[in-house]
Structures are given as structure tokens and as C-alpha cells.
Amino acid sequence: MQTGVSYFSSRVLRHVRADLQDILEHGCTYVVHCFTETDLAYYRETMKGVVQATHDAGLEVWLDPWGLAGIFSGETFTRFPLDHPETWQVLSDGRRAPAACPNHPQTRAFLRGWVEACAAAGGDVLFWDEPHFYAGLWKGDMSGAWACRCDVCLGLFKDRFGYEMPAEFSNDAKAFRESSLLDLLAELCRSGHEKGLQNALCLLPTDLSAHGFPQPQERLRRALESRLGGAPPGAVDSMLHIGVGDFDTAASIPDLDIFGCDPYWYLFGTDAEKFMRVYGQAAAAAAGKRNRGLQMWVQAFSLPEGREDELRTGLRVAAQVGATHIAAWSYEATASMSSIRCPRPDLVWNIIGEEFRRLREL
């Protein structure tokens, strides 16, 4: 059992080294370092030092394209779309969204450059973190407009389906979005392997109702009815379709080594045991068919006070479904980020340490 935690707290090496010792003492075997666009622009050599310090501590280094191009998740900003406005995604209502289109050639060239930077830094694993098209729901946009209908996507859609892309969200639009992300990931994973890096993919839980969790969909529908007087056609489905729901196809990416998901039951307002088990079993089945490692994440941010012990439940279920890699987001219960830190970070971090040490003894 490999146990890890994400880290973005410092670029000052003496502080990083101290934190790495703390991470070791909490039972971790790997660290998921966020390698952002800020790092690409200003901290490339510094990141080499961070990677080396992590290796010196005896920990494996995973590198996360945190927030890159607005395609991968992360509480950080992206500059690439500002520098390349021609890559912006276009919403179904004609508005332009400040995130780069995964299908645009310049976006792909930029992301391949990130892979090269990770190889130069000496990383071990590329962690492809929740790839998705622009998610208006995350920005408070309740219109139901979805991406992407840029010229590149319109052309690719017509080539594949033989007709013009509809403005209303449909099964074909959903399939196109997923296949676009998977095609991008296949290209990036191939690039990673060519440079001697492993690849790990983490997908968000999606298709919630089909997996037995109708609550988020119903909450969103009620919110739209309250705010707009009703949900526009396809709005609920488009707003909740974030990422890739086809686990089997995702796990089949040829150059993928580790497949997983992050069933954050607090975030989705669901039961810890059931949510982790349902999505964990789905991820395990997909990973098992392709002989991939299985990674499961638990939420150590925005964790409600008084529910900290549910982490023990989530980690226990992750082990039961056969996870080879378990991780928590993020270091010290995200204490350094005030907007999403846990109310009692010390308690959360201690629970993670206790459970990680226990899991490694199994």
C-alpha cells in the first residue's frame, strides 16, 4: 500500500524539507507536488530542488498540472488562456470561457511542454488531475451553458457524428467531450512514457444518478427552479457532467499506469461508506481489466467540524476495494489555504497519519 498527500505550501527549500519530514512521520510514501503555471514561469529550477529534496527524504515524486490551462483542477490561476485568447472555449450560448480548449493544437503543445518540464525536474509520476471542460457550475454560472463549441470542436464533432453540433446538451455532445479529453490524455501519457515518467489519472465522480446518488441532481434542479423558474433543457445534465464518466475507456489509455478517482463524499453531500464503495468498486473494476494500479483519494479540505472520523471510514473502504495507492488532499488538512482549510486541521492531519501508518502495516 502506497500512501501520499498533495503539497503546494512552500517553494522555500528549508521549509519544504521540514514539511517532508512531517509527511514521512505521517506515514506517506509519495508526495503529489503541484507544478503550476507560476512554477513553469518562475520556479523551474526551484522545482528541481523540491523534487530532489523529496527524493532525498525517500519519497516518490508525483507532479500535478494544477490548474493548467483551466483544464485540470486546482485552486490557482491560469495564464495560458490570457496569452492565447484564440484557444478559449466557447459556451453553447456563444459566450467565451477563460479556459483553453483541450482540442486546440496550441493547448496541446503547451501541455506537452509541461511534461518536458516535469521530466527535466526529475519527477517520477505525472498525476493527471480531474481533466474537464469549463465547468460553469464551479464559477456560480447557473445558466446551464456548456463547452465547447469553438471552431475546432465544431469541426471535430461534425467529422465524427456527421452533423452540426447541437446547442442543446445531448448524449452525442457528452460523448464528444469525453472522447476529446481521453484523446488529449492519450497524447500526454504517451509523451510522459517517452520521457521515462509514469502516468496516473484521477477522475471526478460523474453520472451520479446512474450510480445511485440522485441527491446532487435534485438539489441542483431545485436551485434552478428557485432562481430561474425552471431548468432549461439539458441544463442539469450539462452542469453535472464534469470530466469523464466512462471509467473503462479511461483506464484503457495505452500509456496509463495508475487509474483512480476522488469520491469526496463531503463535497457531494453523500454518505461516506456508500460513495467511496460505489465509485471505488467502479474504478477498481476498470483498473483491474487493464492491470493498472488503483488510486483512491480522500478529502482533507473543507471537512465539516465533527465529521473528521469519517475519514477513517473512507480510508478503510479504499483499502477494501483494493487500492494500491491512497492519498489525501492535502498536506496538513489544507491549513495553508484559508478558503478551504478544515476547521480543525490538526485533528484531521493526525487522523490521516494514524490511518496511513495502519494501512501500511496491513
Regions found by a protein language model. Name each.
Residues 3-7, 31-33, 61-65, 126-128, ...:
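Hydrophobic faces of well-ordered beta-strands that scaffold small-molecule active sites
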Residues 7-11, 36-38, 66-70, 131-133, ...:
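Active-site beta-loop-alpha junctions enriched in small/polar residues
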Residues 9-40, 120-125, 250-259, 317-326:
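Catalytic domains of carbohydrate-active enzymes, especially glycoside hydrolases
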Residues 19-82, 169-193:
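Aromatic-lined substrate-binding rim segments of carbohydrate-active enzymes
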Residues 60-121, 157, 161, 165-173, ...:
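Active-site-adjacent "subsite" loops/lids of carbohydrate-active enzymes
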Residues 62, 162-305, 314:
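Glycoside hydrolase catalytic-domain groove-lining segments
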Residues 128-169, 206-215:
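Active-site-proximal loop/short-helix segments
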Residues 256, 261-270, 295-360:
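Substrate-binding cleft of secreted/luminal carbohydrate-active enzymes
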